[in-house]
Amino acid sequence: MQNDPIGLMDSGVGGLTVLKEVQRLLPTENTVFLGDQARLPYGPRSVAEVTMFTKQIAQFLRQQARIKALVIACNTATAAALTTMQQTLPIPVIGVIAPGAQAAVQTTRNHRIGVIATAGTVKSDQYRRDILAAAPNSQIFSVACPEMVTLAEQNDLTTTHAQSVVAANLASLMDKKIDTLVMGCTHFPLLRSAIQHAVGSQVTLVDPGLATAEQTVAILKTRGLLNSATTRGTAQFFTTGETDQFDTLASQWLDQQPTPAKHVAIAQLTTPMEVN
């Protein structure tokens, strides 16, 4: 089981930002990633629907690759489905919100923290609850930024148009005197430059992907699941969307040249499968 891959899932390509950190911290681990681009965005969908999608993807990854752990590299899916998945799967399941919230608490100096995310993540209130549980004196300002997900998926990251959209989405945070901003959607680190420009250098950006990768290391070590290999691990990619679009962004973002993604039809996810 130690040689089995770590599974990662997202609504699109944003979860590659988490995969990048996992590969950096665990270079010998095998990984398999599925981006559900055909059903993007998850943000406006109901908790029940996002949970169903998450279950389908987990089942697919377990059937295809016998994953030893699942990283829900999507804030919306973490908010909706993490507890359910942890209760139903016989493998470790790691989400991105708790690690991101803890990183924000450790980063802030004035305890005024901004959170940018999808509508679903903001509505769940999970970041606010997790931050306040660790630091009750914090003030949290949350903003839903669905247009920024679209920018990332379209690989529109550094244009004047992208900067304008980001600035408009973050405008309501400008008078809140935050010193820390959580990028509470795994797509948003792709827009780091535009986000930093919009909020100014006095605001520290928190990427939950790094903290999530660190938690993944700790959990695998505790469970005795770390791969003992000394060679670089393999990486498989699946998408329910256009493979060319996925491959372009994956090759730009990841440190190593990725293998081409394989297309997965939605019917393959919705058809019941046997999982050993």
Swiss-Prot record:
HAMAP family: Glu_racemase. Belongs to the aspartate/glutamate racemases family. This is Glutamate racemase. It comes from Levilactobacillus brevis (Lactobacillus brevis). Its EC number is 5.1.1.3. InterPro entries: Asp/Glu/hydantoin_racemase, Asp/Glu_race, Asp/Glu_racemase_AS_1, Asp/Glu_racemase_AS_2, Glu_race. Provides the (R)-glutamate required for cell wall biosynthesis. The active site is at C74, C185. GO terms for biological process: cell wall organization; peptidoglycan biosynthetic process; regulation of cell shape. Pfam families: Asp_Glu_race. It catalyses: L-glutamate = D-glutamate. The gene is murI. Keywords: Cell shape, Cell wall biogenesis/degradation, Isomerase, Peptidoglycan synthesis.
